[in-house]
Amino acid sequence: MVVSNGVATKGVLEAQGVNVYYGSHLAVKDCNISIPERRVVAFIGPSGCGKSTLLRCFNRMNDLVSIARVEGRITYHGSDIYAPSVDPVGLRCSIGMVFQKANPFPKSIYENIAWGAKLNNFQGDMDELVETSLRRAALWDEVKDKLKASGFSLSGGQQQRLCIARAIAVQPEVILMDEPCSALDPISTLKIEGLMHELKEQFTIVIVTHNMQQASRVSDYTAFFNVESVDRGAKVGSLVEYGPTEEIFQNPLKESTRDYVSGRFG
């Protein structure tokens, strides 16, 4: 449950008692978090704290890692996404993902957007879908006259927005972003941040970022993860504190959160 203005609401995505293992190594322990609808939620914390690992559980990308194992319960609109009846590919149509490094397909700009829609048997006007998706990603004006050009011909920032447009085109409800600006210049980063403000009117966004200033600028809620050493030097990540971004940055409840957001470690 998420509490906003004193009112509790059920999250679009919820993790309950989630543990994530890679082989015998516990990477994330006992995570409980609720992601509210049409908000931006930022995951922050030092390297190795499990924020990207948990993010990838939300659309079962960790299924692609043979030694990964998830315990506990993760629900999407109340339904267990790890239930045997759930098709991971179909789930990823509803819960899209944008990765740290832009990864356009080796196709034209147009086909980068249209490809996923075709695979999902889109029956509408493809030209309209491509234009709408590119407009939502704030890229249309820059590429409208070269839609047949390769996606690789774009700058790094444009490629990342192309990947966002590609995710939008399959009409998800949730967009997961794993450090989408880490390889971008400041101007491209600001464009992506502005885009997130616009996209949350229609989409729920969860972003992993090492940039605390970015988290404070773009998110409505912030989750702070930390890492601790356990037996024989192994490290495990966990969720320390979660709440409205203003509270996390200005009046955190936990000392470790205060130390991290003030730059004392990380």
Swiss-Prot record:
PROSITE patterns the record matches: ABC_TRANSPORTER_1, ABC_TRANSPORTER_2, PSTB
Taxonomy, superkingdom: Bacteria
GO terms under biological process: phosphate ion transmembrane transport
Pfam families associated with the record: ABC_tran (PF00005)
EC number: 7.3.2.1
UniProt subcellular location: Cell inner membrane
Main subcellular location: membrane
InterPro entries the record matches: AAA+_ATPase, ABC_transporter-like_ATP-bd, ABC_transporter-like_CS, P-loop_NTPase, PstB-like
Coiled coil regions in record: none
Keyword Nuclease on entry: no
Topological type in the membrane: Peripheral membrane protein
Reaction(s) this enzyme catalyzes, per UniProt: phosphate(out) + ATP + H2O = ADP + 2 phosphate(in) + H(+)
Limits of the ABC transporter domain: 13-252
Subunit structure of this chain's protein: The complex is composed of two ATP-binding proteins (PstB), two transmembrane proteins (PstC and PstA) and a solute-binding protein (PstS).
Biological role stated in the UniProt entry: Part of the ABC transporter complex PstSACB involved in phosphate import. Responsible for energy coupling to the transport system.
Protein name: Phosphate import ATP-binding protein PstB 2
Species the sequence originates in: Synechocystis sp. (strain ATCC 27184 / PCC 6803 / Kazusa)
